[in-house]
């Protein structure tokens, strides 16, 4: 992991190029959505507006390369839109094809990783891949808002150094917990996963071994899903990708 806290965010923003402007912003109950004339990106809606935004006039009309810098904002509502802007650039069908990252429905982001005997940490209330709990030695779920059986996220500093595989929700990019989580996971295989995850190769040089996320292919469908605050995950409106270091 690079020692500079914001190195990861700088690497993410540096890869966003061109002058494509943002044409629409939508804040749903669960997802923040950024649209351009040709693309769309998501970021998990994250409460937290006590700090003034980096862009007081908002992100509407800004080019994606500028708006993506807001991922580093400590105004977490703005940061969700910043990551959505980055995803509108990175998570496109054309990029998926160019990088060869399509992950078919019957495969999972842990493909090729032997789960037997592993000590696994899961950041965020996720189920993980099928068979994980049968194969692994131990599975710890760590959650900011813990449910029954989850550890509170304060336990990360104790549990994660014991793990050799850690699955991390993409929303950790937005709430700024990711840099420290990666420090705690320096001896583990790390997978950043979820619809908020950008298909950004530079992040693989920042302590992340795998990036697993969503490329939206049904733009009208996902837009209605976000605006109507529909339940369920958004993967039915696109294709999964897996970008890995190995």
Protein language model annotation of sequence segments:
Residues 1-127, 226-228, 242-246:
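Electropositive, gly/pro-rich neighborhoods at or near active sites that engage anionic ligands
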